[in-house]
Amino acid sequence: MKINVNNLTYKTLSEGSIPALLELQEDAFAHAGDSTDFLRRNTPETLLPCFGGDSLVLGVYDGELLVAFGILYCAGDTKENLAHDLDEVSDVTENANVKLVIVRYEYRGNGLQKELIARLCAHAEQRGYKWLSSTVSPENPWSMNNLIANGFTEAKVLVKYGGLKRILYAKKIN
């Protein structure tokens, strides 16, 4: 559905939005057909650390309806930090993950994922991060194209998240 993106609002979200994020994630799975490996199924426990510190959870609203969200996760030295898999990064704490971007099915095709990634990148750059990274399923060309459009390049192919094949993308920003 084509929409007037100028009527949408972007809001920083808090932990209280986790149920809405999970509902939107389930919407993505419901429209995935047989391809359920394209997205990692997050839980409240995997989302909770994404709030606070330098991390950012950014929602896009059409009125009161959450139509998209993006998560920049500054994971520090935890195992969730994708920089552990990047040979070029010597200090993993200088990396932030573009962890998750989901757009409600009816709102796809309006550039929302690309815009969310751009805003997450700008947030990381403003906070002095030197690297950004993200993983994408090889079955998800839309996300790959939106990362590439935001200056990311393919770093390597990995098996992550309990056996899912992922392409690791990275971007040097500072």
Please place each PLM-identified region on the residue numbering:
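Helix-loop element at the rim of GNAT/NAT acetyltransferase active sites that forms part
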Residues: 23-40
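Active-site rim helix/loop that mediates acceptor-substrate recognition in acyltransferases
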Residues: 35-63, 71
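Conserved N-terminal entry element of GNAT/NAT acetyltransferase domains
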Residues: 1-19, 23, 27
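Conserved active-site alpha-helix within GNAT-family acetyltransferase domains
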Residues: 114, 126, 138-157
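Conserved beta-strand-loop-alpha-helix junction that forms the acyl-donor binding cleft
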Residues: 108, 134-144, 162
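Conserved acyl-donor/pantetheine-binding loop and adjacent beta-alpha core of acyl/acetyltransferases
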Residues: 69-100
